[in-house]
């Protein structure tokens, strides 16, 4: 296993789980986020190579960051996470920049973005592409 993926699974996810509502802390969610992180950055790049995305889950400021901050399903939990992590400036610009340097914040935002999909997470690995495509919109 990629040593950074091990770090994310063993250290980042447990810390993120403590900051998020209990309903978001499911094995299916963490598996899905692991697959997304491996797809987006291979857990090697916190800043997109030749691009604007930040964090292992490759958030863009005007896309995923704004979506998490504004979506009805995620905004209150996002504010709570930011408060608990002592981020006073919650502008999309500042949060976007912070995702590159705070893996727990990035994991929380990735879980919150996945939460906005408003569909249950698939139980079959072969169905995992749908929520990824719906929320990350890669390409």
Which residue stretches match the model-derived regions?
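Acidic helix/loop microenvironments that form the catalytic cleft of cell-wall polysaccharide enzymes
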Residues: 37-41, 121-139
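Catalytic phosphate/metal-binding cores of nucleic-acid and nucleotide-processing enzymes, i.e., regions
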Residues: 3-12, 16-27, 35-38
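Generic secondary-structure transition motif, activating predominantly at the C-termini of alpha-helices
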Residues: 17-20, 73-76, 86, 136-137
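Peptidoglycan-targeting cell-wall enzymes and recognition modules
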Residues: 2-11, 38-118
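Surface-exposed patches in mature extracellular/periplasmic domains of secreted proteins
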Residues: 20-33, 46-48, 121-128
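Amphipathic alpha-helical interaction segments
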Residues: 31-35, 108, 131
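Structured segments of extracytoplasmic/periplasmic soluble domains
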Residues: 15, 19, 39, 113-117, ...
């Amino acid at each position: 296993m990629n040593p950074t993926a091990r770090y994310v699974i063993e250290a980042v996810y447990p810390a993120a789980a403590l900051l998020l509502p209990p309903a978001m802390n499911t094995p299916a969610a963490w598996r899905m986020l692991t697959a997304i992180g491996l797809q987006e950055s291979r857990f090697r790049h916190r800043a997109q190579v030749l691009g604007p995305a930040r964090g292992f889950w490759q958030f863009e400021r005007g896309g995923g960051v704004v979506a998490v901050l504004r979506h009805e399903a995620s905004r209150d939990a996002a504010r709570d996470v930011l408060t608990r992590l002592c981020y006073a400036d919650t502008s999309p610009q500042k949060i976007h920049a912070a995702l590159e340097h705070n893996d727990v914040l990035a994991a929380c935002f990735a879980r919150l973005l996945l939460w906005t999909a408003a569909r249950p997470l698939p139980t079959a690995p072969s169905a995992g592409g749908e929520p990824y495509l719906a929320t990350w919109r890669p390409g």
